[in-house]
């Protein structure tokens, strides 16, 4: 693997649980038809709130080379490494590739169609992460002739309209708030009592008692406040900054464990919560894979690689829904999974193989069958094939993969039902969310109304032009075309 690596003493490895052993064989006659990845953004600077919740860490906050909350130079390199790994694994001209699936350029075979589609969560650190992957996947020299670089377009939504990556921040906000309030009254006090010593130490280090965080200007709830402070110390470590005076490595690790336990238990303790945390991404993933499950795929006139970029919460939620267990050695654990390295990437390979004679007898009209092969990679660990615990085999049949998600949602109801969300229809006050809807809506104008608007615009334009000519002549100026 090229690019960013830790020193050998700090190299972390994936535990064996959930990973496929090297000597386990798989069908070698399958073909890759579509590739989907979901990546966590890279290392970032702490959230703004820590300026008031830990004023004694000001020296470290001032040392960051980027604005607070944004991707650091280390985070950018981590995601560039993701792109380089994808290039090494799937690019046609790479010597150690596993499969010749992607062209050397974004522009595809004979410049017929972009091969890769990038979509990011509304947060800028997610879109920057997507851009950094593009740098690694399409380095200088792979752009169109005459322009060495390859700009990669990133699709994004406003956060209030982002239902596939951030439903809890939009239509599910009130549902989330209700669940968080219940957690704060039940489980959170139990955990805080267990970690009382480290929380008291945190208050002394930062100069603000944990219980006072909600009362500060621009403060937040205590659980989220502890999470943001734990993140701050971890980000400081990743940036190579010194420990804040009074903080110890042991206390930082305990704080990180508390924050991760809170995150997992208050977001994913029930199937219902998992459903709305995944939100519309489950539909996006299923549709993206299903559209590639045809014998003519991948066509030169369509995308073949879909690169999605979000927060750790989406990866954890999807993992819980699918039975994808994360086990990174040395990281905090809760609900039988570990936390994630920055840049952790989930790979979904849609593959096709010829039917066996027995399968052909049962499905006379079908020519091939489809399955999903899953891998995991991070800037700190090697590529590992993952078996979903909810699937019967490692190479999960596409129908069974779909059923894992649909069965989960059938138990809980859709995220829209859980969050009491009703998709706006054209004619309501809400603006349409897609370009197609906008175009369709514009077609609804009556011909006379359109002509009236154009007529008024022409009259106003002529009047303004006449006024400018008159004014110029009064001032002795000559009009310039």
Show which residues each predicted segment covers.
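Cleavable N-terminal signal peptides of Sec/SRP-targeted secreted and luminal proteins
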Residues: 4-22
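Residues that act as N-cap/strand-start positions at coil-to-secondary-structure junctions
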Residues: 1-4, 342
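Signature for phosphate-centric chemistry
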Residues: 23-117, 121-306, 310-472, 477-481
